[in-house]
UniProtKB/Swiss-Prot annotation:
It catalyses: phosphoenolpyruvate + UDP-N-acetyl-alpha-D-glucosamine = UDP-N-acetyl-3-O-(1-carboxyvinyl)-alpha-D-glucosamine + phosphate. It comes from the Bacteria. It comes from Borrelia garinii subsp. bavariensis (strain ATCC BAA-2496 / DSM 23469 / PBi). This is UDP-N-acetylglucosamine 1-carboxyvinyltransferase. The gene is murA. GO terms for biological process: cell division; cell wall organization; peptidoglycan biosynthetic process; regulation of cell shape; UDP-N-acetylgalactosamine biosynthetic process.
Amino acid sequence: MYSYIVEGGFKIGGQITASGNKNSALPCILAALLTNEDVILENIPNINDVKVVLDILSDIGADIVREGNALKIKVSNIVKTEIDSSFTDLIRASILLLGPFVSRFGEIDMALPGGDVIGKRRLDTHFYGLSKLGAKLINKDGRIVLKAKKLVGAEMFLDEASVTATENIIMASVLAEGNTVIMNAACEPHVQDLCNMLNSMGANILGIGSNVLEIKGVKKLRGTTFRIGADFMQVGSLISLAALTGGELEIKKADPQHFRLIRHIYSRLGINFEYDKENVYVRDKQELKVKLDFGGHIPKIDDGPWPAFPTDLMSIIIVTATQVEGTVLVFEKMFESRMFFVDKLIKMGAQIVLCDPHRVVVTGKSPLKGNVLSSPDVRAGMSLLIAAFVAEGRSEIQNVYQIERGYEDVANKLINLGAKIKKVKSQ
């Protein structure tokens, strides 16, 4: 186990290139299962979740070559369709094995996935969509067993716009016979990445970026070279970090086309940033003051499926709100346990009222003091790290494995921006 030792009170700024999006990298890596030809993926982040997925592929017989942030994957055949639970326990995204396995190999046997504990995360939408295509689900001793002799396209309406369910159904349907229509599909940037990658392999997916996808099945997919998009969660975290510490920051290759609503929400907290076709710019002088709603009412910030404000930035918004003047209600609609890290911010001196599992009221600006904190999940962990940089004195962030599941080379990248941080082995 490792910890970060952080000295707060220093400006963080400079120049950094955005890492690849973890939530794009994982499904795109697993989409390589759908062809027996070489798949080359660029801009893959070097993070723990990617390592686990690559270990799964190696364990079933895939050939993998990694050079820096590029991957070459070839899945000529596999040696088994049963996935070791030691892998699936570590990562929620292991659920994305279902679609490609049942599509190309006709079956899969795996344990229920692990990962972040931020609330109940249903699997029913996955099973509904895959069963509409012809897969049969067998619940065997707490394991997921799916079998399909043949997949046939179907029309379906998802009861929730689940990202991973949409991705599983897409991967299962690209090689299915006939047409598939997915209504109420997720349309996040990472879903768009997966669709664009599959189309570059010869798939026929229409409606990319919308909530209605039409997939015309093809007989075979070819290899491809595809570049993963930027991690807008990392970019959002860096915007907050620079703004709250008074730094001036340029984030290169940030895919700013995804930041329209994110910029609007940040502006409500007195944080403004600019962007051009590729880069994001954070200036060193920020207002850091809550903008009240009409009539002087306390503003509410809430999340939802894309293009609404992304749930993965809600933890970042909470810590940001502790450092701006004014009061804001933060309403997490999607996960009932994401808010349960705020006790750690309160321990540092934040003024936060936890109303219920979905809502907190944050009043700033609160001076924070360094403390010993443990990362409960990847996004809350980054929020605590931001709090440590803002706080007076020294903090220790424990269980950094959680942060490194989603953020690449955290300590070194922040050191290059002027941060005082070091990674040490925990006592």
